[in-house]
């Protein structure tokens, strides 16, 4: 009986987690509406080093990380670095308000399906903030680095 319970629990755990993309994989395409409702494609940034940042307006750790992301964006944007923010807010108005409050100038897209969006599932996002660093070819080279590690990796990829 105990073995049966253990097997059921392991199966449930296996089915409840998402398979996250891994470093060295090509980043799956993302095509979502931006602030002006035009569709923006992640692939449009090929040729640049890209920080893909999954976040939401209601996520305190996400909002706390934004000043550091803005600092990196402002420092390296002229050298071929871009940020592609993906909001999983359920209300567009909350997302727009957060962009204004935090003075975000980098590319932002909105996926109103939230946690259950195809994009979040494709990337295995089950907690936010969740970041993926892409090289100039669109390959994922790092996931969820701290700010210092991220800056060092960006510098390496830009040189």
Label each region the model flagged.
Residues 42-59:
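Short active-site neighborhood of thiol/selenol oxidoreductases, capturing the structured segment around
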Residues 96-132, 136-137:
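Short, internal strand/loop/helix patches
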Residues 130-159:
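Thiol-/selenol-based redox modules, centered on thioredoxin-like
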């Amino acid at each position: 009986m105990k073995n049966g319970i253990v097997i059921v629990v392991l199966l449930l755990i296996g089915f409840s987690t998402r398979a996250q993309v891994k470093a060295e994989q090509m980043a799956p395409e993302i095509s979502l509406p931006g602030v002006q409702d035009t569709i923006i494609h992640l692939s449009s940034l090929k040729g640049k080093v890209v920080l893909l940042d999954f976040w939401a307006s209601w996520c305190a750790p996400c909002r706390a990380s934004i000043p550091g992301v803005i600092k990196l964006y402002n420092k390296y944007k002229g050298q071929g670095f871009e940020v592609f923010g993906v909001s999983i807010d359920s209300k567009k108005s909350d997302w727009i308000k957060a962009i204004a409050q935090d003075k975000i100038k980098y590319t932002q897209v909105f996926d109103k399906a939230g946690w259950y969006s195809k994009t979040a599932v494709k990337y295995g996002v089950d907690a936010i903030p969740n970041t993926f660093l892409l090289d100039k070819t669109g390959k994922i080279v790092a996931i969820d680095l701290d700010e210092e590690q991220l800056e060092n990796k960006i510098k390496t990829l830009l040189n």
